[in-house]
Structure formats: structure tokens, C-alpha cells
Amino acid sequence: MAAKIIDGKTIAQQVRSEVAQKVQARIAAGLRAPGLAVVLVGSNPASQIYVASKRKACEEVGFVSRSYDLPETTSEAELLELIDALNADNTIDGILVQLPLPAGIDNVKVLERIHPDKDVDGFHPYNVGRLCQRAPRLRPCTPRGIVTLLERYNIDTFGLNAVVIGASNIVGRPMSMELLLAGCTTTVTHRFTKNLRHHVENADLLIVAVGKPGFIPGDWIKEGAIVIDVGINRLENGKVVGDVVFEDAAKHASYITPVPGGVGPMTVATLIENTLQACVEYHDPQDE
């Protein structure tokens, strides 16, 4: 079996085009463009690349993008003060604080300071709790982007045995909630899981997010499985690869995401969707 490639780059561009059309319609109707504030503390090179891609995407769809590049020496109190000001700014619909933050700043305290209606990353405990209770509002971007990919490829997830490898707050845990909503029987594996191979071999839908190149051998993949590889790993030779051995896995899977060009573009596209949602549902003047 040769797997069909799930083209995240193309789907992400479709999503961004749809958002851009809605923004144009808003402006034509006399409404303001959505606003996203992107906050970067320090000069982590990887973070700078991610932030640049998010700002570029904002501008492409017609959002108002506000950048806050703060020095490494910024204190937690100064960062919280900025978030308070952005929470109170009626022209800002989304606040994104790029992680990781420098030592000495409490990630949890910072993320919880963002108002849930402006939490376009979907990391605030309120938004995660809404997802757990089957009443989602703003959803974590990577898991939601994966669901969008499955939907756009008309993949029926109801009744599938889904296995998530990795239990991070950003991907694994919220992904398990999205899969339950999508009708899957869901297993989450992690560093303490025994006999990982057994779980992988029984997965109809496999989502891998551990950040280790080639962590899952291709011959573990069940025939006809759907494989979603969230890993983005740069090797010493400069090549970017996922957590799954792609060439071998593609011989067994029915669908598979490539790295790069699979899940990655969907994370930014979903951030853009979330910002529009925050603007329309929570910040537009509501009809009485």
C-alpha cells in the first residue's frame, strides 16, 4: 500500500484564504480588522523564526499585527503589565506569548494572565477545561489543526482506535480531548508506557508528538492506518524530519503527513482562525 500524502501546506493556504475573504467582508461592512499582538521575550533563534511566520500570516490575511519584542532582561512583572494592557485594548482580539520564556518568568502565571477570550493559543486552563467538557471555545492550535486536516480529507474518525504518543500540554493532552470529540477510542502513551509497539500496531489513527527523529519505526504501523507526525526535528546535516520513519511508514499507512509540510503549517493557520473567531464571537458589538 502506498499512502496518500496529507498536504498540510495546501490545506493551510485554503484556511488562510478563507479567513482573508472573511476579513475583507468585515471591512466592507464597516467593521474593523481583527488584531493580534505577538509578544517575544529574548532572542531565541527558533522562537524568532516562529514569530516571524505568525506575523507574516497575520499580514497576509489582513489582520492588524502588533509586535512586542522584549529584551531577555524583561521581568515577570513587566511582562504581566504588558498583558494587562493588551487585555484592556479593544483593538486586540488575540494575545500570543511565544514560549519558551526566559528563566525566572513563570510560564503558567503568564499564560493564565491572558484573558480567555484573547487566548488564541488555546492554552488557558479555562479554554482547555471547555474542551474537556465538550463545549470548546478557543482550541489549542496544533490539535485543532490536525482535526481540520482529517476533516478536509474526509477521513471518518468515528469508532477508530486512536493512539497519541506524547502527553504534553501543547499537543498530546488536548489532542486526546479532540479525538474523543471526534468519536475515537483514544489511548495516550508517554515515557512510562510499557510495550509501546503493541499500542502503535493496534492504532487505526496514530498521532506522534515526542520531538525525537525516527522514534517510531515504519514497520510498527498497522496496514491502512492514518499517521499524523507532529515532530519537527533538524538533523546535523540540516535535514528536517519527523518522529516517524516516513519512507517505511508510508508503505503501510493509508494516509500520512510529511515533515515538513504536514502539521506545521496548520498550527499557524489555526492561530489565524482562532483570532478571527475571538474577534467575531467575543469582541464585536453584540446585537441587543
Swiss-Prot record:
Summarize the subunit comment.
Homodimer.
User: One Pfam family, short name please?
Assistant: THF_DHG_CYH_C
Listed GO molecular functions? methenyltetrahydrofolate cyclohydrolase activity; methylenetetrahydrofolate dehydrogenase (NADP+) activity
Enumerate the residues binding NADP(+): G166, A167, S168, I232
Catalytic reaction(s) noted: (6R)-5,10-methylene-5,6,7,8-tetrahydrofolate + NADP(+) = (6R)-5,10-methenyltetrahydrofolate + NADPH; (6R)-5,10-methenyltetrahydrofolate + H2O = (6R)-10-formyltetrahydrofolate + H(+)
Q: Which InterPro entries does this UniProt record tie to the protein? A: Aminoacid_DH-like_N_sf (IPR046346), NAD(P)-bd_dom_sf (IPR036291), THF_DH/CycHdrlase (IPR000672), THF_DH/CycHdrlase_cat_dom (IPR020630), THF_DH/CycHdrlase_CS (IPR020867), THF_DH/CycHdrlase_NAD-bd_dom (IPR020631)
Give UniProt keywords alphabetically: Amino-acid biosynthesis, Histidine biosynthesis, Hydrolase, Methionine biosynthesis, Multifunctional enzyme, NADP, One-carbon metabolism, Oxidoreductase, Purine biosynthesis
UniProt protein name:
Bifunctional protein FolD
Q: Which domain of life is it from?
A: Bacteria
Q: Does the keyword Amino-acid biosynthesis apply?
A: yes
Q: In which pathway does it act?
A: One-carbon metabolism; tetrahydrofolate interconversion
Q: SUPFAM superfamilies given for it? A: Aminoacid dehydrogenase-like, N-terminal domain, NAD(P)-binding Rossmann-fold domains
Identify the EC number(s). 1.5.1.5, 3.5.4.9
The family annotation for this protein states:
Belongs to the tetrahydrofolate dehydrogenase/cyclohydrolase family.
Q: Fetch the CDD domains from UniProt.
A: NAD_bind_m-THF_DH_Cyclohyd
Sorted alphabetically, the Gene Ontology cellular component annotations on this record are: cytosol
Q: Name one GO biological process term.
A: L-histidine biosynthetic process
**Entries under NCBIfam families matching the protein:** PRK10792.1, PRK14186.1
What PROSITE patterns does this protein map onto? THF_DHG_CYH_1 (PS00766), THF_DHG_CYH_2 (PS00767)
Task: Sum up the protein's function in the record's words.
Answer: Catalyzes the oxidation of 5,10-methylenetetrahydrofolate to 5,10-methenyltetrahydrofolate and then the hydrolysis of 5,10-methenyltetrahydrofolate to 10-formyltetrahydrofolate.
Q: Does the keyword Lipoprotein apply?
A: no
